[in-house]
């Protein structure tokens, strides 16, 4: 009798579960169930979501970052990302000139492709999950294995613009492209894409409610050794604009010359 009672109870519970399950509530994630319009970065709402997702993951690094800048949308970066997404080159990256943005130079680029339409959150999270291949502070990190992650969480990057395209041909797929300015993934610092420490401890009072820094620089250095040059010859580098060579030096080291106290 006890066994019969237990079986009856199990059957009753299963009946309740089956009855209460709504088959019309399947996740609207894959295929045509996800409308194309909710993926188009030309839409302001989509732009806001992309920014929120990026900044969410930038606060989830381990170890914590003391100097992680908040990302904001950049129209020109989005335009170049969309142009490249439209080319449908699978996972190949755009050229240096194709990613060039005034004041920032060539920007970084992450690409995600899928055989189905998936939310931007899924694409960005896929890049972030490369953190499992990453060791902070190590010289042994491989750009091929962690490059999407390190660009996503590169502290000095503070502008992003993205593009989305449906690619035809024999096998249809969807291309998600984001360009990041200023560019990250400098090989000599690949193991330290940000400074380790308490969130916002590296930006004093320039911190938002998400504990991300806001003291970004409006431009980027185009020469790799601008800061070294400034330490030795500051006037020669930044204050000799009376000659064409002086103006050229300053133009190539805008961040060093004009953004004291900023994260760059």
Positions of predicted regions on the chain:
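Mature extracellular or exoplasmic CAP/SCP-family domains and secreted bioactive peptides
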Residues: 2-264
